[in-house]
Amino acid sequence: MRTLAVSLLLAGTASAIALGSQAIDISRYTIVDLSHAYGPSTVFWPTSPTKFELHQLAFGMTPGGYFYSANSFATPEHGGTHIDAPIHFSSKGRTLEQIPLDQLMGPAVVIDVTSRAAADRDYRLTPEDVVQFERRHGTITRGTIVLLRTGWSRHWPNVKAYLGDDTPGDASKLSFPSYGVDAARLLIEQRAVAAIGVDTASIDYGRSTDFQVHRIAAEKNVPGLENLTNLDKLPPRGALVIALPMKIEGGSGGPLRAVALVGK
């Protein structure tokens, strides 16, 4: 069981985070941003009818003599660095605001398949990959956040390189690596991980037409973290990941700001 407290209290100039009776000196950690910024070049699924839009409402000096700016924004749930809530692929799954915070904050492992993905852009993580990882780095324990590093974030935001095809409205020719079905079952059903994430557009590989990994995860109320970046800056294990989405009532997903704390 993980002992990470849900409430993080920033302790003034000491730059310490109080975790129950413990304290973490933030200066002893490197904070790694795992999220792409939202903007005009943000990558969305080809069938998405819209993309991220930022509309300026105000920008400039006011009659009162002070500066003021404000915007409105609109975005599909599933694009950019975002989370898939279980209801995305299960009618009985949790909606975005129902996901327990302790599934989104905790110890992470990073499984590196960059060399395999470089040789086969449709590569899918296998159970043997997981077993080999555990032989080298120890068993993946209950409540772990699993991150799959394929090296694909290097293509962002080149849509054709990242997704394998840039035809608007057509998702039939996508090509990128991700989790394989059997590996997903091992991690979710046997290891009981808290969440799975990847530095590609989907927790299913690009050519998937039945989205079995999404369905397996949703059935167990395991969220998916997609379009992550900077996984090369994390160790195979030992990082603490905090992946907090917008709290959208009834949402099937939403924008995600994910960070990792790595000991210096």
What residues fall within each predicted segment?
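Bacterial N-terminal signal peptides
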Residues: 5-16
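Intrinsically disordered, metal-sensing/regulatory segments
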Residues: 3-6, 199
